[in-house]
Structure formats: structure tokens, C-alpha cells
């Protein structure tokens, strides 16, 4: 048996300059691996708890408490455990914490160790991480969702919707899809410059111009697709992350200076879907508006991918409730929403068994760690959301997927 010999954590910085946890695990055969935990800006109410220090350091965002929990509590609990038994390691940390949302140890402490253990085990066996976690069936390169215009909580601008994305479906390989999306991104920059708009970027690498309404980004992106030489609809489809929980106040949705009921906002989406080839809408309604979600799914669920992010927070129990109530038809997968590799895998398997699509996702606060690229292939999610191709912490994931493409795997494209 190869066992966990040592565990250590440190405070490092994420892409927004905020502290986060880096965990390092050393195994009895000398193998060592690390992992860095991401952090979100727009977060669901029921996410696992991210432990912050709330003192004078880093405006209260330090993570020394989480680091201390790794070094003083988690290390003692997992040292000596079988490194190849991920489920047992994660179960030990969950039991040690004693809560359903890691409010004692911090999900950022637990996830760092969970990821580092998986990475160390794969390295010890001399196999890729995606193969270790997914086995022989890990073979699908995901269709990327490229966030090329940012708004909402991810940007300081006038756009309400949080993300406007392109999805390159009509290509035979991941590398061809990546090239197309990148060329469209650069064309969009030229169009924005020519129109006198800012080309400053948001947290996830997309541009963050001040635009008149939430339809103008769709018009500009459509123009960029065509001018870059690609076909909108057949090769490139569009996707939205509305992050509508951020817009929901007193039972109404406030955007573009107006107030919308759930039914009115659904009608607004229907009109957008008639005008543009929108494949996916994420968090179209608030995480608290389940009756609205039922209506949204009834009206658009057969035509559009309806993704629950804040709605489901990668939580198996909440997803099960959504499945029973016919809410949404897809789930965003963010490991730090639930807290461990094992729990993430359990949620994905439940979704896939019930016909829900899965989208592996980054957070707005990221790092050079590309764990989710391997994770997406391991779980055959078929889709990945990890920003524009303009910031190194985003490109780390795309570059890892390019490496995986050389080793194995097929690109789903239109067969998603």
C-alpha cells in the first residue's frame, strides 16, 4: 500500500489577488503533488463554506485559518491512509469536519487536500490524472464555453448578465474549436475598439464594455463570428450565464432599469432564443425561485440547455430534488461548491444517470492549477467552462486539454 506520509498547506494568491489555499501531499513512495483551490465571486447560498480569516490582513480575505486546519487537523486525520482510496480519504475529512458544508474546517481546506491526494496518486501510478479518476472510459474532450463578454459580478460595467459565451460545436477536434473561438475573440476586440468601447477584461478574460442593454453583446458577438469567417448557428452557438440570483429582489428581477416577473423574464429569453442561436442559459432564474424554474423548464427545456449553478451548487441532494421536480436539464460542476473530489464525482454520476448534461467549471478567482481540465475528461462531462483565451489562469486549462488531445480522446462537437 502507498500511504499518505505528509500533508502541508500554504497561503498563495489567486487571479484576483486574493489569498487561497495550496495543499501539498507527499506519499510513502516519495511522490509529491500540490493543488490550488479556486474561489467564486457570484456564489450560491447553499455552497460549501469557504473559510476566510475576516481580520485586517488582505481586507479580511486571508485563509490562514484554513491553512492551519490543513496543517494541524486534516494532516493528522489522513496521514497513514491509502493514497489510492480517494473515497476513504474524502470520507475521513467529511467526518472530521462534522457538518454538511464544511463550516468547521472550510471547503477550501478540504478540497485542496482532496485534489492534491488525487494528483499524487495518479503521479505515483505514472498515469494521467484524467485516466486515474475516470478509468478506461475517460475519452471525451469537452466543448468549451468561452466567456468573451463579461458583466454582472464579474465586471464593473453596465451589463446585467454575467457572461456572454460562444460554443464552437462545428469542428472535428478540440484544437480546431479552440482556434475558432480565439479568432472570434480577437475579432471582437477589433470591433469593440472600432466602436470606441473599452477592451478591458473582466475576471474571466472576457471584455467588459459599457453597452446599452443585454442584447447588444449578442449582436456584437454575432458580428465577430461572421467577420472572423465562421457560421453562426452551425459552427458557433451562443450561451448565457444570467446569474439571476444577483438580480432577484423582492420577488422580481431587476435589469435594464425595469422589473420583471418570472414569467416576463422567461418571455424575454424566448424572444432572445428566436433571434439568436442560443444553446445554453445558465441560472436563468434565481436559486430561490423554484416555481419559476419549473415554468422555465416547461417552456424552454426542450429547446435550450438550462443550467443550474447557484440552483444546484454541485450538491447531490439538491440536484436529486431538482430531478424529482423536473427543474432544469443541466448542472454546472464546480468542485469547490461541494468540497471534495468524491462528492463532485457523485453529483456528476447522478446527473448523467438522469439525463442531465454536466458542464465542468472554473471560478472567477482561479490559478495556474488545471485540475478541472483533467476532471472534465475523466467524467466525460462533454462541456467545460473556463473563460476566454486571454488570461494565463484560463489558458492553463485550455493548454492542458490540448495536451490531453494528443494522448487520447474524441471531440464531441455537434454530437454533444
Swiss-Prot record:
<dbReference type="Pfam" id="PF00113">
    <property type="entry name" value="Enolase_C"/>
</dbReference>
<dbReference type="GO" id="GO:0009986">
    <property type="term" value="C:cell surface"/>
</dbReference>
<keyword id="KW-0479">Metal-binding</keyword>
<comment type="similarity">
    <text>Belongs to the enolase family.</text>
</comment>
<dbReference type="GO" id="GO:0005576">
    <property type="term" value="C:extracellular region"/>
</dbReference>
<dbReference type="InterPro" id="IPR020809">
    <property type="entry name" value="Enolase_CS"/>
</dbReference>
<dbReference type="InterPro" id="IPR000941">
    <property type="entry name" value="Enolase"/>
</dbReference>
<dbReference type="InterPro" id="IPR020811">
    <property type="entry name" value="Enolase_N"/>
</dbReference>
<dbReference type="InterPro" id="IPR036849">
    <property type="entry name" value="Enolase-like_C_sf"/>
</dbReference>
<protein>
    <recommendedName>
        <fullName>Enolase</fullName>
        <ecNumber>4.2.1.11</ecNumber>
    </recommendedName>
</protein>
<dbReference type="GO" id="GO:0000015">
    <property type="term" value="C:phosphopyruvate hydratase complex"/>
</dbReference>
<comment type="pathway">
    <text>Carbohydrate degradation; glycolysis; pyruvate from D-glyceraldehyde 3-phosphate: step 4/5.</text>
</comment>
<dbReference type="InterPro" id="IPR029017">
    <property type="entry name" value="Enolase-like_N"/>
</dbReference>
<feature type="binding site">
    <location>
        <position position="282"/>
    </location>
    <ligand>
        <name>Mg(2+)</name>
    </ligand>
</feature>
<dbReference type="GO" id="GO:0004634">
    <property type="term" value="F:phosphopyruvate hydratase activity"/>
</dbReference>
<keyword id="KW-0963">Cytoplasm</keyword>
<feature type="binding site">
    <location>
        <position position="364"/>
    </location>
    <ligand>
        <name>(2R)-2-phosphoglycerate</name>
    </ligand>
</feature>
<feature type="binding site">
    <location>
        <position position="334"/>
    </location>
    <ligand>
        <name>(2R)-2-phosphoglycerate</name>
    </ligand>
</feature>
<comment type="function">
    <text>Catalyzes the reversible conversion of 2-phosphoglycerate (2-PG) into phosphoenolpyruvate (PEP). It is essential for the degradation of carbohydrates via glycolysis.</text>
</comment>
<feature type="binding site">
    <location>
        <position position="162"/>
    </location>
    <ligand>
        <name>(2R)-2-phosphoglycerate</name>
    </ligand>
</feature>
<dbReference type="Pfam" id="PF03952">
    <property type="entry name" value="Enolase_N"/>
</dbReference>
<feature type="binding site">
    <location>
        <position position="363"/>
    </location>
    <ligand>
        <name>(2R)-2-phosphoglycerate</name>
    </ligand>
</feature>
<dbReference type="GO" id="GO:0006096">
    <property type="term" value="P:glycolytic process"/>
</dbReference>
<feature type="active site" description="Proton donor">
    <location>
        <position position="204"/>
    </location>
</feature>
<keyword id="KW-0460">Magnesium</keyword>
<feature type="active site" description="Proton acceptor">
    <location>
        <position position="334"/>
    </location>
</feature>
<feature type="binding site">
    <location>
        <position position="309"/>
    </location>
    <ligand>
        <name>Mg(2+)</name>
    </ligand>
</feature>
<keyword id="KW-0324">Glycolysis</keyword>
<feature type="binding site">
    <location>
        <position position="241"/>
    </location>
    <ligand>
        <name>Mg(2+)</name>
    </ligand>
</feature>
<feature type="binding site">
    <location>
        <position position="385"/>
    </location>
    <ligand>
        <name>(2R)-2-phosphoglycerate</name>
    </ligand>
</feature>
<dbReference type="InterPro" id="IPR020810">
    <property type="entry name" value="Enolase_C"/>
</dbReference>
<dbReference type="GO" id="GO:0000287">
    <property type="term" value="F:magnesium ion binding"/>
</dbReference>
<keyword id="KW-0964">Secreted</keyword>
<keyword id="KW-0456">Lyase</keyword>
Amino acid at each position: 500500500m502507498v500511504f499518505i506520509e505528509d500533508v502541508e498547506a500554504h497561503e498563495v494568491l489567486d487571479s484576483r489577488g486574493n489569498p487561497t489555499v495550496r495543499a501539498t501531499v507527499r506519499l510513502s513512495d516519495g511522490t509529491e503533488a500540490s493543488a490550488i483551490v479556486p474561489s467564486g465571486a457570484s456564489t450560491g447560498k447553499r455552497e460549501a463554506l469557504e473559510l476566510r480569516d475576516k481580520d485586517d490582513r488582505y481586507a479580511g480575505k486571508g485563509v490562514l485559518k484554513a491553512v492551519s486546519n490543513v496543517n494541524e487537523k486534516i494532516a493528522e486525520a489522513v496521514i497513514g491512509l491509502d493514497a489510492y482510496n480517494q473515497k476513504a480519504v474524502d470520507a475521513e475529512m467529511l467526518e472530521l469536519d462534522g457538518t454538511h458544508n464544511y463550516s468547521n474546517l472550510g471547503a477550501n481546506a478540504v478540497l485542496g487536500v482532496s485534489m492534491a491526494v488525487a494528483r499524487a496518486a495518479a503521479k505515483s501510478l505514472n498515469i494521467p490524472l484524467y485516466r486515474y479518476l475516470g478509468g478506461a472510459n475517460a475519452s471525451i474532450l469537452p466543448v468549451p464555453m468561452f466567456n468573451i463578454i463579461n458583466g454582472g459580478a464579474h465586471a464593473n460595467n453596465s451589463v446585467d448578465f454575467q457572461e456572454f459565451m460562444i460554443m464552437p460545436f462545428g469542428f472535428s477536434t478540440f484544437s480546431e474549436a479552440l482556434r475558432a473561438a480565439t479568432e472570434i475573440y480577437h475579432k471582437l476586440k477589433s470591433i469593440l475598439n472600432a466602436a470606441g468601447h473599452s477592451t478591458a477584461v473582466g475576471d474571466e478574460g472576457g471584455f467588459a464594455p459599457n453597452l446599452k442593454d443585454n442584447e447588444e453583446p449578442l449582436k456584437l458577438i454575432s458580428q465577430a463570428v461572421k467577420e472572423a469567417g465562421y457560421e453562426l448557428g452551425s459552427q458557433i452557438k451562443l450561451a448565457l450565464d444570467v446569474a439571476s440570483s444577483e438580480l432577484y429582489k423582492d420577488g422580481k428581477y431587476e435589469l435594464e432599469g425595469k422589473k420583471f416577473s418570472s414569467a416576463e423574464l422567461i418571455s424575454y429569453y424566448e424572444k432572445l432564443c428566436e433571434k439568436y442561436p442560443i444553446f445554453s442559459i445558465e441560472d436563468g432564474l434565481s436559486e430561490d425561485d423554484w416555481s419559476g424554474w419549473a415554468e422555465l423548464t416547461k417552456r424552454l427545456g426542450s429547446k435550450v440547455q438550462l443550467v443550474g449553478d447557484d440552483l444546484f451548487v454541485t450538491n447531490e441532494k439538491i440536484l436529486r430534488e431538482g430531478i424529482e421536480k423536473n427543474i432544469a436539464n443541466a448542472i454546472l460542476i464546480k468542485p469547490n461548491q461541494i468540497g471534495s473530489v468524491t462528492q463532485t464525482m457523485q453529483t456528476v454520476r447522478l446527473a448523467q444517470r438522469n439525463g442531465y448534461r454536466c458542464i465542468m467549471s472554473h471560478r472567477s478567482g482561479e490559478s495556474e492549477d488545471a485540475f478541472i481540465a483533467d476532471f472534465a475528461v475523466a467524467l466525460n462531462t462533454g462541456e467545460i467552462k473556463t473563460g476566454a483565451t486571454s488570461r494565463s489562469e484560463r489558458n492553463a486549462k485550455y493548454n492542458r486539454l490540448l495536451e490531453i488531445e494528443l494522448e487520447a480522446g474524441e471531440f464531441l462537437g455537434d454530437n454533444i
